[in-house]
Regions:
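Active-/binding-site microenvironments in catalytic and ligand-binding cores
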Residues: 1-298
């Protein structure tokens, strides 16, 4: 298992200041493109996660009936407020996996020396959890697989291998460099939120050769528009039959962050293949990821 000098943060924690400056200089138009779709109760999610829910906690009518105004007696202005519970996994909609999200082997280890027997409490992991997620302000690259293939959306279980990643970059006129964030479009979010249509296209994505291709180029994070990032079922699970070899290679072995359920449709429509990538994960102690609303700045 790889152990980094940034054991709880990974290579993204070593982003050089000069790379931040170079990324900032990429902005030419000042246009902001959101890479996330709205979240809502009943939204499509990976089946291993709990459903997303929003419930009222206080309403203007409710506080009057209950006499529960936090500022004392009913005011002449009739001031009220609304507050809510949001109950959800941190892996709802566009999100980033913390390093303490996936484990492997009998010792249930994760990147940077984390192990379930030592670092997993009843209130979540204490090593490599979401409170350690760094901010991202670096160059982003879009790899648009359906545009390259001339289709709207990749077919169910279609792998994107290293050779195709390289060919797409050539067609787009971009190259992947150290410190980049790579986002891979399959067209899946173009079907959002029609769960029935989406199910017919689950789940295309990078295979293990594509993961190694990204590692060879020094990326610090990678994302896609599907719930699993990598192609499922894995065409090359290895001798141990690992169902998610890409997560293992990137997140567990090298500390490269993975994002899922990104909305890359507007980037693709405008043929924006390189951009300033900005993401500010929410630092929640004990969480295994963070909902994010990343922005591509053009």
């Amino acid at each position: 298992m790889t152990v980094s000098s940034n054991a709880e943060v990974g290579p993204a924690g070593e982003l050089p200041a000069e790379q931040v400056v170079v990324a900032a200089r990429m902005v030419r138009e000042g246009r902001l493109i959101s890479l996330a779709s709205p979240r809502f109760p009943g939204m499509p999610l990976f089946p291993g996660h709990p459903p997303f829910q929003v419930l009222n906690y206080r309403t203007p009518r409710g506080i009057r009936v209950a006499g529960a105004q936090p500022w004392g007696p009913l005011n002449d202005a009739g001031l009220g407020y609304m507050a809510e519970y949001v109950m959800a996994t941190s892996h709802s909609g566009a999100h980033m996996d913390a390093l303490a999200h996936m484990t492997v082997a009998d010792d249930m280890h994760w990147f940077g020396g984390g192990r379930a027997d030592e670092h997993l409490t009843d209130f979540g992991p204490v090593h490599g959890d979401a409170s350690k997620l760094p901010p991202f302000f670096t160059r982003g690259v879009l790899i648009d697989a359906p545009a390259f293939r001339g289709v709207d959306c990749l077919p169910k279980g279609s792998p994107i291998d290293a050779a195709e990643m390289e060919a797409i970059c050539g067609a787009e006129g971009v190259e992947v460099r150290p410190w980049d964030v790579v986002v891979v479009r399959t067209g899946y979010m173009g079907l959002w939120p029609d769960a029935e249509r989406m199910a017919a296209h689950q789940t295309a994505g990078p295979d293990i050769s594509a993961a190694r291709w990204m590692l060879d180029r020094g990326v610090i994070a990678a994302g896609s528009d599907t719930e699993t990032f990598e192609v499922q079922p894995a065409p090359d699970p290895g001798p141990a039959g690992n169902p998610q070899p890409v997560h293992t290679a990137l997140l567990i072995e090298r500390g490269v962050y993975i994002m899922e359920s990104l909305d890359l449709e507007e980037l693709a429509r405008h043929k924006v293949y390189e951009f300033l990538f900005v993401a500010l994960p929410v630092k929640i102690r004990g969480a295994t990821g963070s909902m994010v609303d990343p922005v591509a700045v053009v």
